[in-house]
Amino acid sequence: MRKKRLLSRISFSSLFLLCGTLLSACTGIQADLRNLIKETTGKDIDLSKAIKTKEGKKNIIASLKKSYEVNPRDTTKLLLDAWKQSFEEGKLGIPDFDLTM
């Protein structure tokens, strides 16, 4: 049972890391993320600078986790929008999928 909990925590953190990295490339979503983090944590993070450092990435992930605890619906929507945009632009490193319709 503990292995399952640990695995889900690791998977959850990996999802936030992936989405946090993807958000750095999406300027429209970047503004939404900045506002969401500011509303839920009170921190005003410069994402373009924070995403370039290991400590900055940790801060973004921690802020996203806190934001998810406070406002799961908006946080999830933002992360899924960022993932979708990055996927459509081919920034996920999965070139074999073509989702354009």
Swiss-Prot record:
GO CC, any one term: plasma membrane
Annotated compartments: Cell membrane
Membrane topology of this protein: Lipid-anchor
Domain of life: Bacteria
Record keyword Hydrolase present: no
Signal peptide: 1-25
Key words, A-Z: Cell membrane, Lipoprotein, Membrane, Palmitate, Signal
Lipidation (S-diacylglycerol cysteine): 26
N-palmitoyl cysteine-type lipidated residues: 26
Coiled coil spans: none
Cited Pfam families: Lipoprotein_3
Similarity remark: Belongs to the MG439/MG440 family.
Protein name: Uncharacterized lipoprotein MPN_467
